[in-house]
């Protein structure tokens, strides 16, 4: 669900996860609010640690039965693990229909079933529809589900109010890249880098654009800048590996795939598939 976007929020989340894992390792009780447990589960799911995410949710619902945040995370976890009917059942059990996160979840389930008009109507009823956080969530939902025109409608909703806002600029860049408007996306990513040169996600935006354009040397250089900003940024290792794979540089490709697997940036089976192909060349 991507709740933790700002650097301060990410720092708080890292501390929270560290405290949770230390308490678990020591078999020590640690009381956490439902929203804290939901954030931990969300992080585990984003790292493809689905069993750990389920453990947190199960524990959370024992001490916070029926909590909306935890039920939302449970539904998304079922979606992540291709258990659509279970996800629907959990979503239907949530009583807070007015909650914007609930509406986003139910809209995703509708889009999974190809029910675009129903999803559009549901999203139009979100109370804080003109807030930037909501616009970002809805644009990415439509893009992820393959509805770029619907995404553009919501992107335009924020243009007059947020056009100079860094988060809105990042959203615009990602929209342009996702809809194959690569040159325009590059312009936006460079503007974002001028604002925040140590944000690895902006450099990764450039990487993907250059990779699509087959400007491999520029893509590798942008990967290096992303890793200079965050040497644990697994996606940069994955794309750097793809670049070396493209250049038939087996040793560097394998080294970077191994690092990407270690950081859980790509599924191990995918990484080892590339490594095996390079090993026999």
Where are these regions (language model features)?
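Canonical tetratricopeptide repeat
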Residues: 73, 105, 137, 171, ...
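Start-of-helix register in tetratricopeptide repeats
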Residues: 35, 69, 101, 133, ...
């Amino acid at each position: 669900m991507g709740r933790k976007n700002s650097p301060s929020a990410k720092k708080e989340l890292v501390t929270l996860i560290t405290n949770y894992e230390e308490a678990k390792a020591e078999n020590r009780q640690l009381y956490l609010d439902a929203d804290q447990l939901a954030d931990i589960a969300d992080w585990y799911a984003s790292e493809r640690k689905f069993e750990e995410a389920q453990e947190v949710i199960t524990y959370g619902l024992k001490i916070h039965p029926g909590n909306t945040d935890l039920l939302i995370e449970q539904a998304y976890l079922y979606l992540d693990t291709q258990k659509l009917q279970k996800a629907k059942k959990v979503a239907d059990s949530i009583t807070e229909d007015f909650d914007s996160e609930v509406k986003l979840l139910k809209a995703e389930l509708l889009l999974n079933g190809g029910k675009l008009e129903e999803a559009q109507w549901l999203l139009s009823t979100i109370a804080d529809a003109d807030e930037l956080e909501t616009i970002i969530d809805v644009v990415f939902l439509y893009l992820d589900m393959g509805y770029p025109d619907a995404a553009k409608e919501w992107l335009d909703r924020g243009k007059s109010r947020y056009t100079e806002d860094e988060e809105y600029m990042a959203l615009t860049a990602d929209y342009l890249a996702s809809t194959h408007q690569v040159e325009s996306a590059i312009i936006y990513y460079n503007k974002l880098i001028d604002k925040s040169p140590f944000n690895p996600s902006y450099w990764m935006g450039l990487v993907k654009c250059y990779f699509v354009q087959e400007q491999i040397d520029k893509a590798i250089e942008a990967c290096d800048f992303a890793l200079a900003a965050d040497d644990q940024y697994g996606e940069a290792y994955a794309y750097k590996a793809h670049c070396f794979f493209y250049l038939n540089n087996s040793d560097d490709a394998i080294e970077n795939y191994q690092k990407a697997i270690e950081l859980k940036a790509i599924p191990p089976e995918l990484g080892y598939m590339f490594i095996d192909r390079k090993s026999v060349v």
